[in-house]
Amino acid sequence: MVHGFDAAADTTAQEQSGPEAAWITRLGTPLQGASNGALAGLVFAAKDNIDVGGLPTTAACPAFARTAPAHAHVVQRLLDAGAALAGKTNLDQFACGLNGTRSPYGAVPNSFDASFVSGGSSSGSAYVVATGQVDFALGTDTAGSGRVPAGLNNIVGLKPSKGLISARGVVPAAQSVDCVSIFARTVQVAVQVLRAAMGFDAQDPFSRSLALEREPFGPRFRFGVPSELQFFGDEQAAQAFVQAIEKLQALGGAPVQIDYEPLAQAAELLYDSALVAERYAAVRGFFDEHEAEVMEPVRSILASGRRYDAADLVDAQARLRALAQQAAPMWEDIDVLLLPTAPTHYRIDAMRADPVQLNKNLGAYTNFVNLLDYAALSVPSSLRPDGLPFGITLVGPCGSDLQLAELGQRYHHASGLAQGATGEPLPPPADLGLSRPATVKVAVVGAHLSGMPLNGQLVERGAQLLEKTHTASQYRLYALPGTVPPKPGLVRVPPSEGAAIAVEVWQMPLAHYGSFVALIPAPLGIGTLQLADGSSVQGFVCEALATEGATDITHLGGWRRYIESRQPIAAA
């Protein structure tokens, strides 16, 4: 039992409208956590399918309400880290929806325009973060409930790798793919909360000990973009995504088209196969006795799980596994997947008029993520001409949570947006604690120079140009005959016989250096070059024997001058 509450919760459904609909239980005085800790001074809210000891857990269904005997594992960890709990927030009933209107406690509005949906199912959590009522909030995410509301409200939604945060004490939606998610106005706060919340829990059968990738994406990275995208007629959203691609390119990303079909087919399995039986199984004991007290369309979704048998479930799981294998090679071509968080916005009255199809549309780019065991981060991207937010989602393999956060923080700050709906500017970017990749400096002198035929071998390995400079005056440069593409040979000679040769110095991740060196054909190789400033770097060298019969081009000062000298002069 929890002490310190001075406000009791009324679990009788009293439909609210406007901002009041965001809360189901709001404490008069926040429940204080530890007096010190990583989260000291931060106030949070919990989605009301997450237990807080001594308070009712309703899952937005009054007939289901029960007083929680103890805190959910994640709530306890956050309190122990110093955060204070302000209350519990509204949701789509039993976390079954992506729009925020499926609750007897009221439809939660969008924080930018109250006539539009907030997104769900973690509707209240997103709203109270976006409007500055709390510093962060817990949601849950099975099909996008921790991402869609973030994208529609100009905030950050962190959907961790499955099992990274314990779900013990959370009312399950589909337990094998449920994740506790985090809403915040900045990536920095979301990562602070993640570090406090994560950890293996032996009492949660789906908890995992995961070693997170701690090396950020390099200055050059590849991001996937679906070859075909659907925005359901929303041209403003379509244009916003084009701009998002351009923003990610400006951060060093190279777009790569991917086949979205395996991901889309996996998403379809969530509700249109025997996998939906897991949603029914999650609340079967209650639902079989109280079906009439569950609101539509949640009732129909849960009831649909009854029509499948065990063989159907085995077939669906096999189909999902096949799609996972079909999608896996995508990660050989890209480092991260870029998607719209939601393809469009819908008005509340439109959603109520067509609750199934429009809800399905909102999940067009989220439903597959948990099924395929990926991590995801939704970050604000822009405000559309109509004033509504547009968010993007960065998706990566399991364990890429911190990598996504580092890139997401860079992207968020490049957007120039304010925090949520508060109008407050973003604070400066924070050090998220990732390790910088080990790198090596390599000087290139010929076909690997910027704009030359082999420069792509550097770029595709994440190498970054540091400077254009010269060697010390103790080298000679030769044009090697018979090389394709044409290449020079750099040979060290006594200072009295040499000259300074133009080079470019590139910085390359050490992890990719070996594969780069393996591409270098004889008589070329890698050695140590001395630069004009006296420093030494790795760089291209040539066997002296190979220069016999080669053209000495030292007097030109570099390979680029040599190539230019061979170009035909255009007639005046």
Which stretches of residues belong to each language-model region?
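Short, well-ordered alpha-helical
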Residues: 1-72, 94-97, 241, 346, ...
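Short Gly/aromatic-enriched secondary-structure transition segments
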Residues: 13, 58-65, 454-471
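A short helix-breaking turn/cap at a secondary-structure junction
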Residues: 21-33, 159-242, 262, 406-434
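Short helix-loop capping/hinge segments that flank enzyme active sites or metal/cofactor-binding pockets
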Residues: 38-61, 218-222, 274-324, 328, ...
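Gly/Ser-rich, acidic/histidine-flanked active-site/gating loops
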Residues: 44, 50-53, 64, 77, ...
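Short glycine/serine-rich loop segments
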Residues: 71-72, 76-197, 370-393
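Glycine-rich, small-residue loops and helix-cap segments
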Residues: 80, 197, 308-438, 478-496, ...
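Acyltransferase
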Residues: 235-259, 283-289, 313-334
